[in-house]
């Protein structure tokens, strides 16, 4: 299943796409977060070009599992995004992903 990954930022969104098997992700580009309609237009174009079947958004939870200020922003973004696209949107817990990537 082809997936699109979004790394949410206040000013820019990092976009990555999976390979055809949905196993490896490759960075694509950054899209300005505002205005939202321009972001959404570019996102939909990428989705159509790459035949994306799902979106995964990184969720920056605290180490204790709680939601900090940035995670609350991501949660709100995901809720809006789910109403803006026709594919499933899910979150991925980002705790320790930077540590794992360094190894």
How does the language model describe each region?
Residues 7:
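Conserved catalytic-loop position in the HRD/HxD motif
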